Regions:
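Core catalytic lobe of class I
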Residues: 1-175
Length: 175
């Protein structure tokens, strides 16, 4: 097994698929349509694609003091144009596996959110919302540390998305 930047042995290998109940997770390049076809093989299109993409922010010296290795790509080396192309590539690769009315979301920071939104718009997705994940502690690294991550959500196609929450269905409560 290959070593990570921390000297620890990597557990997942490129191409590994892990079964998580009825869900699957693949270790691979999300911009590669073949990887996603292999992951989704035999399944109907998904109602949700949820990712935690690299933010195109250098890890070493910015996010941490050296405990973690850099991402394989989009780890601060991409220009704005390259990061937009990266986002277009992974979203475009995911779209054939997302049903009409399906929701796509990716965790990102404030620097990358406009780029994700531009890529989604370029591919015809409809913005649904911007969710803020408020964490209990701020991240490490810079003077202005974020205590949140952003989760922009987009919808594919014209069909309604599935609403399992049903807010307001049984009355409205205001706080």
């Amino acid at each position: 097994m290959p070593k990570t930047g921390t000297g620890r042995t990597a557990v997942a290998r490129l191409g590994d698929i892990v079964q998580l109940g009825p869900h699957r997770l693949i270790c691979g390049d999300a911009t590669d349509p073949i990887v996603l076809r292999r992951l989704m093989e035999g399944d109907p299109p998904a109602r949700l694609v949820l990712t935690d993409e690299p933010y195109n922010v250098k890890i070493s010296g910015h996010v941490t003091g050296g405990a973690h290795r850099e991402f394989a790509m989009a780890s601060g080396e991409m220009s704005d144009e390259e990061f937009l192309a990266f986002n277009v590539a992974w979203i475009e690769a995911a779209l054939p596996h997302l049903c009409d009315g399906g929701v796509l979301g990716t965790f990102i920071d404030w620097r990358g959110a406009p780029t994700v939104a531009a890529a989604a718009a370029k591919l015809g997705l409809t913005p649904l919302n911007l969710i803020v994940w408020a964490k209990t502690n701020a991240g490490m690294g810079s003077l202005y540390r974020s205590q949140h991550e952003l989760l922009p959500l987009f919808k594919k196609g014209d069909a309604p998305h599935v609403n399992n929450i049903e807010l307001g269905k049984r009355g409205r409560w205001r706080s």
